[in-house]
């Protein structure tokens, strides 16, 4: 599996509760915070839910 870098680029203020929980489940709390994860189908789905809040790059 490929590794991806996920960066929170926008605030979760004003977003739906499920989007906030998804961002938290990705391991992101603050704007600009970056986490690295293995790309899985589950992770792809989580990224799709919050694609307007995060930036994803393959490593």
From Swiss-Prot:
Gene Ontology terms: biological process: translation
Question: How the protein assembles, per its UniProt entry?
Answer: Part of the 50S ribosomal subunit.
Record has Metal-binding as a keyword: no
InterPro entries the record matches: Ribo_uL30_ferredoxin-like_sf, Ribosomal_uL30_bac-type, Ribosomal_uL30_CS, Ribosomal_uL30_ferredoxin-like
Q: What name is this protein filed under?
A: Large ribosomal subunit protein uL30
Sorted alphabetically, which keywords does the UniProt record give? Answer: Ribonucleoprotein, Ribosomal protein
GO molecular function list: structural constituent of ribosome
């Amino acid at each position: 599996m490929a590794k991806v870098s996920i960066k929170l680029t926008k605030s979760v203020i004003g977003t739906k509760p499920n989007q906030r929980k998804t961002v938290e489940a990705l391991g992101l709390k603050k704007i600009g915070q970056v986490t690295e994860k293995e790309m899985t189908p589950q992770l792809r789905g989580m990224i799709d839910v919050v694609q307007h809040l995060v930036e994803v790059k393959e490593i």
